[in-house]
Design a protein with these regions (language model features):
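Conserved structural motif at the start of ABC-family nucleotide-binding domains
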Residues: 2, 16-19
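The feature captures the beta-strand-to-loop junction immediately N-terminal to the Walker
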Residues: 33-35
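Helix-to-loop junction immediately C-terminal to a conserved catalytic motif
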Residues: 48
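Conserved ABC transporter NBD signature motif
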Residues: 56-64
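Conserved ABC ATPase "signature" region
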Residues: 110-125, 147
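Catalytic Walker B motif of ABC-type/P-loop ATPase nucleotide-binding domains
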Residues: 159-163
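ABC ATPase nucleotide-binding domains
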Residues: 231-256
């Protein structure tokens, strides 16, 4: 289990996270939602071990995160950031292969890279220059990279995804969340920062709702999502509809 408890992060006088807590267990998809500047990405980076914090604790499988060495941590969790800068010319397939451990058997490496490219619908771009890909295509290649990272180490572990659908068209948004669900169903855990509240409602077992650095609500979507919560998060009025699979958001008309 991944656990963050009472995390506080500051930058000078600004409080970025204020007593933020969440737990992520195997078999679950958790979505962090909230407005810009709420601290969503910072909390994910704290869990990833990529952001220092001034107060609180982060543990992975009961061990403080700072006690994990980099190689062991890479076998347990893979991180998809909002954007990745690639400074050298690579083919798309080579970017995916960067997720593999050093000295990984070549035949198995080729198999996993091909599998991951198929999973994200990018096999045809394997020999294409990464620089020539669109933003959404690059995002899918990076998703394939983190999938390979976990598959090479047993296939489970935790996916930490920071806005994985932001650059994608609707079919690939849905496909990305299907991949996340399948990873959880196979025994992994997924934490995703999502801006599209309806995608979050569709995909997540649990929502973590954040505003101004604080977690103001968390739980199953059916249990916590109300018009009042949406107003508290975003300052807008919305109706909450329901279908058998769960709630969905209907913003008020913008036509006046």
């Amino acid at each position: 289990m991944y656990r963050a408890e009472n995390i506080r992060v500051t930058a000078g006088a600004k409080v970025i996270l204020d007593d933020a807590s969440l737990s992520l267990s195997a078999g679950k998809v958790i979505a962090i939602v909230g407005p810009n500047g709420a601290g969503k990405s910072t909390l994910l980076k704290v869990l990833a071990g990529e952001r220092r914090y001034g107060h609180g604790t982060v543990t992975l499988d009961g061990t403080p995160l700072q006690h994990w060495d980099a190689a062991a941590l890479a076998r347990k969790r893979a991180v998809l950031p909002q954007s990745v800068v690639v400074a050298f010319p690579f083919f798309a397939g080579e970017i995916v292969a960067l997720g593999l451990p050093q000295y990984f058997p070549r035949s198995e490496a080729l198999r996993l890279v091909e599998r991951a490219l198929r999973e994200v619908d990018m096999l045809s771009a394997r020999e294409q220059s990464y620089e020539t890909l669109s933003g959404g295509e690059r995002q899918r290649i990076q998703l394939a990279r983190v999938l390979v990272q976990l598959w090479a180490n047993g296939g489970q572990g935790y996916l930490l995804l920071d806005e994985p659908t932001a650059s994608l068209d609707l079919p690939h948004q849905i496909a990305t969340l299907r991949i996340a669900r399948e990873h959880a169903n196979a025994g992994g855990g997924v934490l995703a920062v999502l801006h599209d509240i309806n995608l979050a409602l569709m995909a997540a077992d649990e929502l973590v709702a954040m505003r101004a650095g604080r977690v103001i609500a968390k739980g199953a979507p059916k249990e916590i999502v109300t018009g009042d919560l949406i107003h508290a998060l975003y300052g807008v009025r919305a109706e909450i509809g329901a279908v058998p699979s769960g709630p969905f958001l209907l913003p008020q008309s913008i036509r006046g």
